[in-house]
Structures are given as C-alpha cells and as structure tokens.
Amino acid sequence: LGDVPGTSGAIFVARPESNHPDRFGLFGAPPLEEGYVVLVGDRGLKRFPPPSEFLLSVWNRSRAARLVCCSIVLCCLCLTVFLYLSENMGQAVTTPLSLTLDHWKDVERTAHNLSVEVRKRRWVTFCSAEWPTFNVGWPRDGTFNPDIITQVKIKVFSPGPHGHPDQVPYIVTWEAIAVDPPPWVRPFVHPKPPLSLPPSAPSLPPEPPLSTPPQSSLYPALTSPLNTKPRPQVLPDSGGPLIDLLTEDPPPYRDPGPPSPDGNGDSGEVAPTEGAPDPSPMVSRLRGRKEPPVADSTTSQAFPLRLGGNGQYQYWPFSSSDLYNWKNNNPSFSEDPAKLTALIESVLLTHQPTWDDCQQLLGTLLTGEEKQRVLLEARKAVRGEDGRPTQLPNDINDAFPLERPDWDYNTQRGRNHLVHYRQLLLAGLQNAGRSPTNLAKVKGITQGPNESPSAFLERLKEAYRRYTPYDPEDPGQETNVAMSFIWQSAPDIGRKLERLEDLKSKTLGDLVREAEKIFNKRETPEEREERIRRETEEKEERRRAEDVQREKERDRRRHREMSKLLATVVSGQRQDRQGGERRRPQLDHDQCAYCKEKGHWARDCPKKPRGPRGPRPQASLLTLDD
C-alpha cells in the first residue's frame, strides 16, 4: 500500500459496520470483523486514547469487567488472611493453665463437688507464681502430672508455719481434675505406666524430682532468671564402704575383694582369716547393708538404733549424705531457729541417735557458739527429784554429760538415759532459739496486702515464740494472741472483726474463720476501681447539690435582710410624720394656724401669701431595686 500515491503514512482503523451503540466486544472494546477496514490518509488520521484511558473506559462501560476485578481483589484478600491465620495458629500453645481457664465453669463445678470454692485470679496466681517456688518441678503453666501434683499437695498440707492452708482448695481441685479428667483434659493427661513385675533384687531409692518441667510439647520453654540462687545438691545415699568410727584400729583397712561377675553383692565380701579379731559393729553394719532385710523386721534401716531379727539392737550411724543434705537444705540456727529445731526434733524422734550421734549432729548443723549455747540451756533444764531445776553438778552430769558416758543401748537403763538426754537436748534447742523479750518485734508483724489470715497467724505465733517467753499454743495466752491478730490484721479485716457480736466469747479459731471469709470476699482491683469511681461521682453530685442549696440560702437571706431594711425605713418615716404632728402646739378655736394670732383663721390670714397653689409633693418609697 505504500506504493499507492497519497497513502504514505496511512494506518488501518477498525470501524464497526453498524453504528448501533450497544454493540461492543470483550470488556467494551469495539469488535474487529472482516470487511470493516477503512484506509485513511494523513488528513483523516484520528488519534487513539492511551491504554490507561482505555482501561477506564472499559471499567465505566462494562459491568462484567467490574465484577471480574472485584472478584480477583476479594480472592487475593481472602488468601492473605488465610495464610496469616494459618501461620499464627501454628504458633499457639495450649497449656494446662490456659485449658482450665477456657473451661472455668467445669473447674468451678469440680470444686463445688468437693465442697470448696476457688477463684480465677487466685487460681492463676498460685499456679504461675506460688507453686513453682516449691522446687518440686511445677511449671508456671501448670501440669497434669500426678507425681508433681502430689509433691505440691504435700507442701501445701505441711503442718506448722511451712504449710499453706489457703491453697488447699486449689490444689485439691487441680488433683481432682488430673485424677478424674473431664473430656477436655484427657488428651493432655500423662498415660499411666504399665504395671511391672516386682524386682528380684532390692532396687535403689527413687531419684528426687527434678526442678525443671518435663519435656513435652504441652509446655512452653521457660527461661530461668539470671540471678537465681543455685539449689544445694542433694547427695544420694552412698552404697560404698564406710569408715568404722567405733573401731580403734588405725587405717589402712583391708581392701574389699573384687566384685563377682554376676553382680551379687555377697561375693564381694572378704572372708575373715583365721586369727583375725572379731568384726566390729561397723563391719557388721557394712555386711548387713548388702544383705536383704530380715523378714520380721519392721523398723527402718536408716535408724542409728534398730531392733534386729535376733532381738538385739544394731547400731546404724548417720551417713555423710544425710548430714550434708540436712545442713545445706535448711537455714542456719541463727537465721531460723524454729525450722532447724523442728528438723533436729524429727531426727531425734525417728532415728533414736546415741550420744555420739547427737554430738555429730550438733557439730554439723550448729556453729561452735550455737552449740555451746544449746548445751548450756539443756543443762539448765535438768530437774531434780522434786521436779524443779537443780543446781547440783552430779545430777546435771548424770543426766546431761559433756563427755562420752558409758550408756549401753542394749540395756533398758542405757536406753532410758538416751531418751532423757534427747529430751533435755530438745529443751536446750528451744530455749536457745528464743531471742530476748521484745514486744515491739511482735507488734511489728502485720498482715500483708495479699497474705491469707492463716499464714499471718503462723507468722504471729512464730514471733511470739521467738521474741517472748510465752507459748502461743498455751490456752492462757490465747486472748493475747487473739487481740494481736485483730489489731495487726489488714485494716479492712480488723475493722470487721472488731464489730463482731459477742467478741469476747470468740475463740482464736473462730476469728481465723471469720477473717478467711472476709479475705475471700475481698473486691478485685476492677471492682475497687469501679467503687472508687462511683463514690467520686456521688461525691461530686453531692457537692454540686450543696453548692446550689447554699446559693439559694444565701439569696433567701439577702432578700430577708433587704426586706427588714425596707420595713425599717418606712416605719421610721411614718414615725417622723406622726411625731411632727404631735409636736404642733394646740390652737384655740379662734387662733390662726399660720400666724398664730387670734381673731381669724388660717384661710383668712392676711399674712398668708395669695397665689396659685403648687402641686403637693409626693412621698417617696424605697424599693428593692433602690
């Protein structure tokens, strides 16, 4: 076409065959059909719109184009939301604590069946803050492991000041959920281990529970704080040979024989040679540890003195691991004398130690100064035949000797001496643990903001034991302890306890129960904020009403004063008029009122000026506006 004259630079333009306005192609574009091509020269050249204008024209002229574009945008948006939710849901972790909070109605129903009451805020506090500090392996997000729950329950039910009575309903409810799990707990409960056959050989004691939570996908990874104090290591009971402290033979000792291939401990012993001295009680003890216990023996082998199968008492001294654990897992005597005294008391009652064992126990758990103080107080507690403390040196040395006595624990007399010695030693520990009387220390013990009344009472009793010579458990001191409990409780609890009816007849237990009810009914921080806001609004409304009433009273008083002033002015003017008329002299019947001469009246008085009469002046009255 370029050879045709006059057609250089010509282009093809598509025009529809018909000029009908409703005929369009896809998305509103004009259709290109055969037979519709027109050759146009330079003069008739028509400029086409750019692609952007073409797209806008398609959007404005076609409903199908708008529908397709909206569908594409909506699909992209849905796909983005789906990918975002799938990624976030994959990172969510379900924990026992969150599981119980999601099903809190079932938790409350379980607690109601156990006749206890639980609250969600304290449930979260105990699970995430209190129970992890017991060092029994409880994670901050909770667990359904029955072993760990049992360990926490033992801590909660501990007698004395170390127990937590306020946490009893919560751990009991948690244990009930783990033992009899609802349907929403069963997938997370640890399966019970299969029953195994009884071992043929005596097994080692179980390892203590670890302080770290079990490795499971149910528990998130917990990071330990940077400044955590390392726990003292608990040594297991050593099964190796011990040194015979009772024998007088110096080391070296004979080496034990090589162990047998079958692992039987009896073959590892070395038979005594002929002419060798009789084995000491320690050697008998070492042999007895490798032998199975006697069938008819019901006492623990951990006791220093235990009754053997032949009716003779056998001596089992303390192991080094026991002494190490007692020393490193308990506070010092100066720091907490009550706790260490309770430990030594339990050891004295259960292990039945001899005089040497008592000295070893005191030397391990007490310092030199503390030991001397305990021994001095114990010797002061020795009583004579009349039941009073004695000062006779012979009686004191017989009952509580400072040097090793010749008490034979195989005889009844020797065992009686040991029992009396342990009682005196326990009395010395209790007396030495008391600080000088300081009632200010007792008065300084106050209830914390979130401390339960039971825990506060235990701290108060401990202060009485430590800083006063009185025993808080004595019925004669119950009134003093009760008054201190009321006055030193939290302000809200103390005010309500003081308003109790017949307060004098209430026992200390009744006061603690009432305080527990008040403590459990305390308002939450949200309720407290709502109450403060409501009281503030009521106070503002009351203040505004008082201001309005005061303004009305002020206006009424001002109006009353102005009325009194107006009445006073008017009455004064009236009195002036009446008084002026009375002061005029009385005239005779023929006397002039104007010139006071007789013979004519005032209207005929020649001295009175004649002329038009002016207007009579009007009396002016004061109004409130003036």
Curated annotation (Swiss-Prot):
Cytoplasm listed as a keyword: no
Cell inner membrane is among the record's keywords: no
Record localization: Host cell membrane
Pfam families membership: Gag_MA (PF01140), Gag_p12 (PF01141), Gag_p30 (PF02093), zf-CCHC (PF00098)
Biological processes per GO annotation: virion assembly
PTM: Glycosylated by host. Cleaved by host near the middle of the molecule, releasing the c-terminal half containing capsid and nucleoprotein domains op GAG.
Residues exposed to the Cytoplasmic side: 1-66
Key words of the record: Coiled coil, Glycoprotein, Host cell membrane, Host membrane, Membrane, Metal-binding, Transmembrane, Transmembrane helix, Zinc, Zinc-finger
Coiled coil spans: 526-566
Topology class, membrane: Single-pass membrane protein
Protein name: Glyco-Gag protein
The organism of origin for this protein: Friend murine leukemia virus (isolate FB29)
